[in-house]
Amino acid sequence: MLIPSKLSRPVRLDHTVVRERLLAKLSGANNFRLALITSPAGYGKTTLISQWAAGKNDIGWYSLDEGDNQQERFASYLIAAVQQATNGHCAICDTMAQKRQYASLTSLFAQLFIELAEWHSPLYLVIDDYHLITNPVIHESMRFFIRHQPENLTLVVLSRNLPQLGIANLRVRDQLLEIGSQQLAFTHQEAKQFFDCRLSSPIEAAESSRICDDVSGWATALQLIALSARQNTHSAHKSARRLAGINASHLSDYLVDEVLDNVDLATRHFLLKSAILRSMNDALITRVTGEENGQMRLEEIERQGLFLQRMDDTGEWFCYHPLFGNFLRQRCQWELAAELPEIHRAAAESWMAQGFPSEAIHHALAAGDALMLRDILLNHAWSLFNHSELSLLEESLKALPWDSLLENPQLVLLQAWLMQSQHRYGEVNTLLARAEHEIKDIREGTMHAEFNALRAQVAINDGSPDEAERLAKLALEELPPGWFYSRIVATSVLGEVLHCKGELTRSLALMQQTEQMARQHDVWHYALWSLIQQSEILFAQGFLQTAWETQEKAFQLINEQHLEQLPMHEFLVRIRAQLLWAWARLDEAEASARSGIEVLSSYQPQQQLQCLAMLIQCSLARGDLDNARSQLNRLENLLGNGKYHSDWISNANKVRVIYWQMTSDKAAAANWLRHTAKPEFANNHFLQGQWRNIARAQILLGEFESAEIVLEELNENARSLRLMSDLNRNLLLLNQLYWQAGRKSDAQRVLLDALKLANRTGFISHFVIEGEAMAQQLRQLIQLNTLPELEQHRAQRILREINQHHRHKFAHFDENFVERLLNHPEVPELIRTSPLTQREWQVLGLIYSGYSNEQIAGELEVAATTIKTHIRNLYQKLGVAHRQAAVQHAQKLLKMMGYGV
C-alpha cells in the first residue's frame, strides 16, 4: 500500500513569493529531457516547483525518503507517479510494479516507455529530494531512464547535490535545464515581497536589501528572521546579522534559541514527537502526540510558520521542511530519549491501523520492540514477501532474537524462504536443521511438513532429485488440505522429479495438477512453471503441436498477469525457440532466443548461456559457420567462467560438437571426448542429449563401434520411456553412423524410420544439420518414388532446406565446375559437341538437388514456362527423356569428377 502523501504535490501557500523570473525559465522545461534544481537545504526548491506545477494536469510528483533506496519501493512509487500524470495510461507497467513482476528497474522502465509511446501530449515527472538516493542500481537505472525516455516527457529532479545522472552528457547535448543555488537565492525585490507578506509592520526596502545580502538570499534564513521578528525576540536586522555566514549544517543552536525556546512547552513537545514521522495526518498525530485534534494542531503549527507544509490538495497529509525535520529528530533524541521508544511504538500502532505495515516496521525497529516487530511480521510478513520487500524482511528478521523465531516457527520458515529466493540453498538446510533440533515437537505436524516442502524445492534446485522426491512425498502426506502454498510447492517438485526420471506421463499429470492449484490460489509463478514443464514433457514425448499449444497458454498467462520480467519468461521463449528450430522456422527461433537474452539482460552474462547456444544452433542450421564460430567463442568463454547445471553444459556441448562435425575438427572433438562427463544413466531427455553428443564425436573420429553401442542403448531407453523426440534424434545420428561406415542399407532403414517418426514430431532442422550426406540419401529415396505421401513431402521439404542453407557448389554446377568438366578427358562427346548454356547447367543442378519445376522457377526468379523450355533443351542435349534419367546423368558426371555420390 502506497502512502498518498509521497505522491502528492505540495500545496501552494498563500503567503509565498511567486518567483516570476525562475518560473519564466521553467516555462520552457518541455524542451529538455531533464530539469535539474540543485541547492543546499532551505533555498526553496520544492516551493518553486510547486508554483511551476500549479495548474498543470499531466504531472506526477514523487517525494523521496530514505526508504526509497529499496529498488522495489522506488519502482512502485515512480510508476504510481507516472500513472498519476497519465490518468492510469500505463496499466501493464503499474501491475508489474505492484506485483514486483520485473527483472530489473531498467526492464520495467523499458516496458513503461513502450506504453508511453502512445501518449503524445507533454508529460512531467517530478522527483523531490533525490539526494536521499544512495543505491547505485537506482542511479544506473535513472541514467537509463533519461537516455531512453520519450521526447514528450520531462524529468524534473530536485536535489541538494549534483545527482549521478550523466549530467555532463546532457549539458553538452543541450538537453539539460539547470537552476542552482545562486539563481534560487532571493533577490532584493523578492526579499522585500517576502517580508511584506510575513510581517505586520513593513520594513524599508534598503533594510530588507541589507538583510537579504547578509544571508546571501537564503530563503530559510529569511523565514527564520520573519519568525523571530513576529515573536519580538530581536529586530529583523539583528537576526540577519546573527544568521550571516551560517549554513544549513550550523543551524542547530540558532533554531534552539530562536524557535524551540520561543514556543510553549506543549508546542515544543508536539514538534519533537511529531518529527519522528516522515509524513503525518490527523490519526498519526493524535496517537503519537496525544493531542485530541491532530488536524487542528497541524494547521495551527502551519499558521505559526514553523516549517510545516501540506503534502496534498486535501490538506490531510503534512510534513516538516527537511532541514527543520532533521533538526527536530536530533533534538528529540536529546530531550525525549526516555520516551522515544514509546513514541515509536505509538507511531507503529497508528501506521498499522491505517494499513501500512512497512512503515510500522520502520518504527518498531526504531523502538527496539522485538515483540511488536514479531507481531507485525506474523500478520504481514508473507504479504511483504510476495511483494518482494526482501531487504526490509531481512533487516526485521535479523532484529528478532533467535528465541523469538523458535517460538514462532512460521518466521523460521519465512527466513528460510527468503534464503531460498536468494539461492542460498546451503543456508536453508542449516537453518531448518537448527530449528528442528531446538524446537520441541517440530518433527511432527504441519510445520514440519512445510519445512519438508521447502527442503524439497531446495533439493531439486540443487540437483538432488531422489532427496527432493522423498521430502516432497513426506510433505504431501503430512500437509492439511488447506495449506495450499506448500502443497503446490511439493506437487510441483514431485512432478519435476518424475520428469527427471523419465516417467513423463505421471509427471505431466502432476504438473497439470500443480497448474490447477496454482491458478485457483493465484500463485502465478508456479502456474507458469507448471506450464513450462508440461511443454517440455510434451516435446519429449514427440507431441510438438500440443507442446506449442501449451506454450500459448503460458504466454497468455504472462500477458494476463504481467509476468514478462520473471526469469521464467526466458525459459518459455527458449523452449519456444527450440520448437521453432525443430520445425525449421529459423528466423522466428532466432527472434525468440534473442528475446530470452533481453529478458535476462540485467542478470549475469552466464545466465544467457542457453539462449546463446540456441542462436548458434540457428546459425548451424543455416550453414552459417562464420557466424556460428563467432558466437561459439563467446559461449566457450562463458563456459570457462561459470558453474552450470549439467543440462546447461549438455546443451552448450551439442552445438560445439555439431560445429566440429561440420568443420571436420577432429582434434577438438577428441580433446572434448577425453574430458567430458559420461552420465551413469540415459533415462531422461537431458541425459540422452549428453550421450548423443558423445556418439556424434565418436562418429566424427571414426569410432563407429563405440558410437553404435551408445546409440542402440539410447534407443532402447527412449522406446521404453516413450522419449519419442529423442528416438527421432537418435535414429538420425545412427543413420549418419551407418552411412559413413558404408552400411547403406542399414542407413536407409533407420532413415525411413526417422522420416516416419517425424510425421509425429514435425522435425525438419534435425535432418538439415546433417548436411550433404542427408541430402544424397533423400535424393535417392525421392528418385525411387516409393516413399508414402507424408514422408515424400517431408523429404522434399528437408532437401529444399539443405539446398537453401548447405549448398555445395557441385549441386549447382557453377562456372568453374563446368569449365573443368568440359576439359575432362572422359566427358561425353554429346556434351562437348552440344554444350549446355550456363542457365541450363544451373537448372540441371537444381533438378539433381530435388527441386520441382515451380521451385526452380522461384529459385532462379523466372517464369515456369521459361524453366520448361530450359528443361526441354537440356534433355535434348543430354539425350534423356525424363527427370530421373537427367538426375542419373548428373550423378554420373559428378562421380566422373571425383565427387562421392
UniProtKB/Swiss-Prot annotation:
DNA-binding residues: 853-872
Question: Which GO terms of type biological process are on file?
Answer: positive regulation of carbohydrate metabolic process; positive regulation of DNA-templated transcription
The record's section on Pfam families has:
GerE, TPR_MalT
Q: Which SUPFAM superfamilies does this entry report, sorted A to Z?
A: C-terminal effector domain of the bipartite response regulators, P-loop containing nucleoside triphosphate hydrolases, TPR-like
Q: What does this protein do?
A: Positively regulates the transcription of the maltose regulon whose gene products are responsible for uptake and catabolism of malto-oligosaccharides. Specifically binds to the promoter region of its target genes, recognizing a short DNA motif called the MalT box.
Tell me the PANTHER family matching this sequence. Answer: DNA-BINDING TRANSCRIPTIONAL ACTIVATOR DEVR_DOSR
Q: Which residues form the HTH luxR-type domain?
A: 829-894
Q: What is this protein called?
A: HTH-type transcriptional regulator MalT
Q: Where, in this chain's numbering, is ATP bound?
A: S39, P40, A41, G42, Y43, G44, K45, T46
Q: Which UniProt keywords apply?
A: Activator, ATP-binding, Carbohydrate metabolism, DNA-binding, Nucleotide-binding, Transcription, Transcription regulation
**Cross-referenced CDD domains:** LuxR_C_like (cd06170)
Activity: how regulated: Activated by ATP and maltotriose, which are both required for DNA binding.
Q: Does the keyword Flavoprotein apply?
A: no
Give the protein family. Answer: Belongs to the MalT family.
The entry describes its oligomerization and partners as:
Monomer in solution. Oligomerizes to an active state in the presence of the positive effectors ATP and maltotriose.
Q: Source organism's superkingdom?
A: Bacteria
InterPro entries (alphabetical):
P-loop_NTPase, Sig_transdc_resp-reg_C-effctor, TPR-like_helical_dom_sf, TPR_MalT, Tscrpt_reg_HTH_MalT, Tscrpt_reg_LuxR_C, WH-like_DNA-bd_sf
* Gene Ontology MF terms: ATP binding; DNA binding; DNA-binding transcription factor activity
